[in-house]
């Protein structure tokens, strides 16, 4: 599905033809990105200046239809010209930089998976795959229906010249939605990389309670290992030759005393009974020395990967974030006027004017379509942020368990502590946003609904009966 969207984006001039190749023909790469906007401007000027063709020139188009058509057309012009100018800005450089960084990240992830022996396990994500394909299929069906309705209505009205009014009606919203589709794809790729890092960190977290270092008891005073002093019966028998048989009872008592001392030393060296009461609360597992690379050896690489993916998120947001602003603004305006026309016009005089019904339904269809695209953008941006935060939470959980590899090597502890501290700075520094005007998360929905409610309260107070009566739509 993403390949279809990329090819369609190339055809309508939203991305360069050879975006992943550096040494190509510059004119050929950016030809469609110049031809299509010029053709759009020609159609826009043809309708607004020459007055040769257009929905507003028809006799059956009343004042409400003309107002709706002008608003839809000029808002689409603002949306399309804005995203086109932003698409020309370092568009090819972004694709090359994104692919290069993504390849480096994937190479390190594969190396970490080999170290953690996760490449031998077949990871299934059926649920995520079904949701992913269903989302793209649903969007494809919605856009197909919107384009079919607009093209069919315009063809019945203008015949073979229907492509001219189509370029100034639905085409700008289609182009803006495709750009947001590119943003959705890149954010989903970033979110998947965060998920892979979290899987590797979770494997370390699961192994933290089952893999320990061997314990060695040291004598604090001598700064060395405790050594036992053993007394053998041979030594005692040798003493008999020098002291005589009369001291036999004395040596027997001394043997018993030294054997008791030896038993006490053995009890001091035996730490197996105290292991169950350890503050670290380890499981009853066999303590063995780690010989070779284990999952925790990936920690330094995983921390670097996390920073690289966050840096990739910054680049992606810098490329597509400015294009979210005009799209969200167009979605907001179209949705408000779609509700207004549906409630104040179509409910009262629906079916009495074909062109008025066409404009009303066009507002409703594209308001629903743009809202769906905006919601998916917000959802994926929230998912990417949540996966990024989950990495820090897993690392913090590992630190709370105090595994042996962290206690025996200060490098791991310092790395984990630095990572959690650095993530706090990242969290305050970056979040997916629209050039700082609003954050791309679920709070944007609440803000938009609140603002739309305020505007609708004002708009719905207008009395449309007099206007509709003057247009002959009401008796």
UniProtKB/Swiss-Prot annotation:
Entry keywords, A to Z: Cell membrane, Membrane, Receptor, Transducer, Transmembrane, Transmembrane helix
BP GO annotations: chemosensory behavior; detection of chemical stimulus involved in sensory perception of bitter taste; male courtship behavior; male mating behavior; monoatomic ion transmembrane transport; response to toxic substance; sensory perception of bitter taste; sensory perception of taste
Membrane topology label: Multi-pass membrane protein
GO molecular function per UniProt: ionotropic taste receptor activity; ligand-gated monoatomic ion channel activity; taste receptor activity
Biased composition (Acidic residues): 265-281
Phenotype upon loss of function: Impairs avoiding all nonvolatile repellents tested, ranging from quinine to denatonium, lobeline, caffeine, and N,N-Diethyl-meta-toluamide (DEET). Also displays increased male-to-male courtship.
Cellular location(s): Cell membrane
Keyword Cell wall biogenesis/degradation: no
Residue ranges with Basic and acidic residues bias: 251-264
Region of interest (Disordered), residue spans: 243-281
Ranges per topology, Cytoplasmic: 1-34, 90-128, 180-319, 379-441
The keyword Membrane is annotated on this UniProt entry: yes
One GO cellular component term: cell body
Tissue expression summary: Expressed widely in gustatory receptor neurons (GRNs) that respond to aversive chemicals. In larvae, is expressed in neurons of the terminal external chemosensory organ, and the dorsal, ventral and posterior external chemosensory organs.
Extracellular compartment residues: 56-68, 150-158, 341-357, 463-475
Top-rank lineage group of the source organism: Eukaryota
Pfam family, one: 7tm_7
Residues passing through the membrane, by range: 35-55, 69-89, 129-149, 159-179, 320-340, 358-378, 442-462
Family of the protein in this entry: Belongs to the insect chemoreceptor superfamily. Gustatory receptor (GR) family. Gr66a subfamily.
Function comment: Gustatory receptor which mediates acceptance or avoidance behavior, depending on its substrates. Required for sensing all nonvolatile repulsive chemicals, including tastants, pheromones, and especially N,N-Diethyl-meta-toluamide (DEET), the most widely used insect repellent worldwide. Also functions as a pheromone receptor for a male inhibitory pheromone leading to male-male courtship suppression.
Name of the protein this chain belongs to: Gustatory and pheromone receptor 33a
Source lineage: Eukaryota, Metazoa, Ecdysozoa, Arthropoda, Hexapoda
